[in-house]
């Protein structure tokens, strides 16, 4: 479980977040939406211990962060990028574990390629493989699909959903795309303009997600409700 309690953040004279409280159950997929500058990414970085806060965050020890720009090392191959964190942790069987992770995200056969040779969607798959290879208890995702075209984005949403249902990690996604949030999440957290506060938490009433659900009237009703 992840517990966010009374999280407040100032950057000099600017208040980014005000008294944010949020409990996220183990294995839950949560998305955070809201206007630009409302503190969504700041909240994610606070949960990751990348930014300090006046409040408290309780979470499992083993987590991963997927950045918007994929944060790949250009001088390392696809295989080398996936093996990096395992090298830092002294993990055994790096090669075989990396191969499994790459197969899970559809990048088997590209082990010896370099990041500059990959499409935007492939780079994001690689970033996800690098995060999943250590079997984290939770994953924080900061707009990871924002740089790809819409068709690729929908395919990656489906793949991310499959990874989550398979590996049972807790996920927190920051996104500007409300349909994406509804497709992936158990609940969608809606934040106010700065200083960011939670104004609504919407339960998503769908058990399973398939591409066809995007055309469902109820799906679009939920999207429109969150959009206001």
Give the location of each predicted region:
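Helix-to-loop junction immediately C-terminal to a conserved catalytic motif
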Residues: 48
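Conserved signature/switch motifs of ABC ATPase nucleotide-binding domains
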Residues: 113-116, 134
């Amino acid at each position: 479980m992840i517990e966010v309690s009374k999280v407040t953040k100032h950057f000099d004279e600017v208040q980014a977040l005000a008294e944010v409280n949020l409990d996220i159950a183990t294995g839950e997929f949560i998305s955070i939406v809201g206007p630009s500058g409302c503190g969504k990414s700041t909240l994610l970085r606070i949960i990751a211990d990348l930014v300090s806060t006046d409040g408290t965050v309780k979470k499992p020890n083993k987590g991963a962060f997927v950045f918007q720009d994929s944060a790949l090392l250009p001088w390392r191959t696809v295989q080398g990028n996936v093996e990096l964190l395992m090298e830092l942790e002294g993990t055994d069987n790096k090669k075989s574990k990396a191969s499994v992770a790459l197969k899970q995200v559809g990048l088997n056969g590209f082990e010896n390629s370099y990041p500059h040779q990959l499409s935007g969607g492939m780079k994001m798959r690689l970033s996800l493989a690098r995060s999943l290879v250590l079997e984290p208890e939770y994953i924080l995702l900061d707009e990871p699909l924002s740089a790809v075209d819409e068709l690729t984005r929908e395919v990656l949403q489906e793949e991310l959903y499959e990874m989550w249902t398979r590996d049972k990690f807790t996920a927190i996604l920051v996104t500007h795309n409300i349909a994406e949030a509804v497709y992936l999440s158990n609940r969608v957290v809606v934040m106010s303009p700065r200083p960011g506060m939670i104004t609504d938490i919407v339960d998503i009433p769908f058990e399973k997600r398939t591409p066809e659900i995007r055309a469902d009237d109820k799906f679009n009703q939920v999207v429109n409700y969150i959009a206001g």
